Structures are given as structure tokens and as C-alpha cells.
Amino acid sequence: MRKVKPKLNLTSQTARIVNLSHDGRGIARINGKATFIQGALPGEVVEFQYTRVKKDFDEGKLLSIVEPSTLRVEPKCPHYQMCGGCSLQHMSAEEQIRFKQSHLLDLLSRYGHTAPQTVLSPLTSHPWNYRNKARLSTRFVEKKQSTMVGFRERNNPRFITEINQCPILNSKIDTDIVHLRKLIDTMEDKQCIAQIEVAAGDNEVALIFRNLTPLTEQDESKIRKFAQQFQYKVFLQPGGLDSVFCFYPSDAHAYLSYELPDYQITFQFHPNDFTQVNAELNRKMVKQAIQLMELKNSDIVLDLFCGLGNFSLPMAKHCSRVIGVEGNRNMVERAYMNAKSNHITNVDFYAANLDDVMEVRNLVNTSFSKVLIDPPRSGALEIVKQIDSIDPERIVYVSCNPITLARDTDILVNQKGYVLITAGVMDMFPHTAHVESIALFQKG
């Protein structure tokens, strides 16, 4: 018998918000079921309309605030209500931090079945113009005879929010979005550019144009003039990631750079490389991680998911030796390049399958007193399941997903004999629900 799909009640409803979901949506309890409403805050009475009805939960669209929360602030961005670039601008900066810290501790309790002995003070940065990496979608609209440049719409990712500014993006891009749109509007093939990747170093900003078809000579000339006038490095990507090349200046080397001034280290990176989005917060994060490691001159440290050496190189200045292991061979080459340019010789880097700890052990074949783990959103499940083969006395875990951190914490604490000494959030992405965190584990 075919299930009957519940009908949407399209009349406006009123509800009181009792909590926030992990992604920052307000939660109302109606007839024993959770209803998620984007843009609503705890304590508020809101008017909303159902947009989705499921067996276990419903979703609604916020229509108006009947009783506002004292935590509510006016969003800075004029595109905020539609744009999917961020989701918490309606919440005060202080409350955003409290929400993220509470979310982390709740997940550690619920899925990690533990709590840290102490909670770290949150790491924060300037909340605006912090985002040094982004992907902007573009689309030429025939009916309007104009180009849309922006992030995907929050409630309908098939569509692009046309933006004239973005207060979370690097300040140069924030200012120049309108000029980017004008550039594409003047091109002969206005459908050619599908997206624009933004990557900023400390002193330069690069744009990667994903061109679906070869550029005409006239369009190449227009892009060069744009890059020259507004001072950008421009890369083209005619195919896959391996096809990216520096288009302007033609004689420029392909790298951007950022500095960790506390350690007198400068990193060079390709615009396609993974680097932290928020430079100010990254500097604070590296410093905190090294403090938590409590490095001694005799320590040999293993840095897993080491990337281009963001933690490895500064740690190497405080210990005997650092071994960095990374799954991406290109990043291993970049890490060696950065070690050489910074005259750091007590580091080695290897490419390995980080789901196979025995491969890592056989590759490096040494003992480690301390380990730093900085995995992707999927976490470090295989690493923590096989941590006995490394047996470090201290682990610092840097996480970009509190759910997988909580899962891995459960294994480390309840199966492997480690103690969760401390943990806390690092607000790498202000005005979004994204939670970056750091945790210290000590062998019990």
C-alpha cells in the first residue's frame, strides 16, 4: 500500500522557539514533533509557514518575529535573508560563541560519553572580512541580460543569490564583487565562466576562473585588463583541478603566501591548496595547539593530516623532530618546499593512506611521544582505533566537525585509556554554524 504524503498546511502558524539545532535553526515543539525554522532564536515567538512535513520532524519558513529575543541583532549584510553564505548574522557575536561551545560540549557528552576536565576559553577573531577562501557561482541570465555572481541561495541551492557585497569575504573581494560582475557582462561568451574561486594570502588575492569553453582572444584581453586594474592574480581552470594554471601575470610564480609571525615562518601555497580560511584565527590556533602539546627538546612528534606544514613547521622549532604524514602527495611536496624556504631541517614528510595506521608506522618506523591530528570532516576513526600502535602520551586533536570529534573521543577515552583534559571551540567561521574545535588527550 502506497504511503500518503502529508499535505502542507500553508496557513501561517505561531510557535515559541525552545532551542537551536546544530546548524543554527530555531526549534519549536508542535504536537510532540520538532519544527525547524531558519532565522528564529530561542525564547522568540514567531510566525511561520510549513515548507516540509516529515514523519519525525517538520520544517518551516520564518514569516515574522512576534516576540523578539534580546539576543537578536540586525544582520549587517543586505543579502542575508536569502544568501546561503552564512546563517547566524541575526544572532549576537557573543551568543554565537556560546551556542558553538554548548553544541560542542553537548556532543562530547552525548556521543563521546565524557566531558573535558576543563573548558578552554573560545578563540575568536575579527568577525568581518575574515574569509580568505570562497567559491562564488556565476550565471548569465538571458532575460535580464546581466550576470549573477554570488553564493547559492540558502533555501534553494539551485539558484544563485545576486550579491553586491559580502561582509564576511576578504575586504578586497567584498569591494570588487560588482566589478567582477561587470567583467563577465562585457565578455563575448558570457556563459563561459561557471564559477570563481577566491584565495587570498597576506599580500595578494588570486581568482580562479572555471571556464567551460576556451576563452576568445578578446575575452582573454578583458580578463588581463581587469586583473591589472584591480591587482589580482588570475588563474584559469579549463578542466579538472590539474588543469589550473596562472594566466596573469604570465611571468608570475603560482604561489600566494601567509605568515605565522610568532614563529617567523612564511608559507607559500597554491590557490587550490587547502589552507585555513581565517588567517587571524589560524595564527591563534597554531599557538594554542603548540601550548597544549607542551613540547620538550627531546620530543619526537607525529603530525597526521599535516597538509603543507601549518602545524609541523612551528612545532619543529620546539622539539627534536617532527614527522608529518599527509594523504595528498602534492601537499607533501608543498610542505617540503616550505620547510626548505624557512630553513627548518628537523622535519620529514610522507604521503600515506591515513586510514591505515600500520602503513604509517611501517613508513616512519619510529616512536612518538606526542601526536597532533588535524583531520577532514570525516574525522580520524581508523587512526584512533589503531592508536595503540603509536601509543603517544599526549594527543592534540584539531577538529572541523564536532560530531566526528565526539565519536573519536568516545574511542580514545572509553576504549583506549586516554583522558580528555580540555577542549574548546575556535570560531574559524563567524556568522556560520560551522564549529572548529581543539581537544587535548592525555594517556591515563
UniProtKB/Swiss-Prot annotation:
| Family annotation (PROSITE patterns) | SAM_MT_RNA_M5U (PS51687), TRAM (PS50926), TRMA_1 (PS01230), TRMA_2 (PS01231)
Which catalytic reaction applies to this protein?
A: uridine(1939) in 23S rRNA + S-adenosyl-L-methionine = 5-methyluridine(1939) in 23S rRNA + S-adenosyl-L-homocysteine + H(+)
One biological process GO term for this chain? rRNA base methylation
- All copies of the TRAM domain together span 5-64
Q: Which residues bind [4Fe-4S] cluster?
A: C77, C83, C86, C166
**Binding-site list for S-adenosyl-L-methionine:** Q276, F305, N310, E326, N353, D374
Which controlled-vocabulary keywords does the entry list?
Answer: 4Fe-4S, Iron, Iron-sulfur, Metal-binding, Methyltransferase, rRNA processing, S-adenosyl-L-methionine, Transferase
Which parts of the chain span the membrane according to its record? none
- What are its E.C. numbers? 2.1.1.190
InterPro entries referenced in this protein's UniProt entry, alphabetically: 23S_rRNA_MeTrfase_RlmD, MeTrfase_TrmA_AS, MeTrfase_TrmA_CS, NA-bd_OB-fold, SAM-dependent_MTases_sf, TRAM_dom, U5_MeTrfase_fam
- A GO molecular-function term, please? rRNA (uridine-C5-)-methyltransferase activity
Q: Which residues form the active site?
A: C400 (nucleophile)
Segments forming a coiled coil: none
Main EC class the enzyme belongs to: transferase
Record's family?
Belongs to the class I-like SAM-binding methyltransferase superfamily. RNA M5U methyltransferase family. RlmD subfamily.
Q: What's the stated role of this polypeptide?
A: Catalyzes the formation of 5-methyl-uridine at position 1939 (m5U1939) in 23S rRNA.
Q: Which HAMAP family match?
A: 23SrRNA_methyltr_RlmD
Q: What is this protein called?
A: 23S rRNA (uracil(1939)-C(5))-methyltransferase RlmD
Gene designation: rlmD
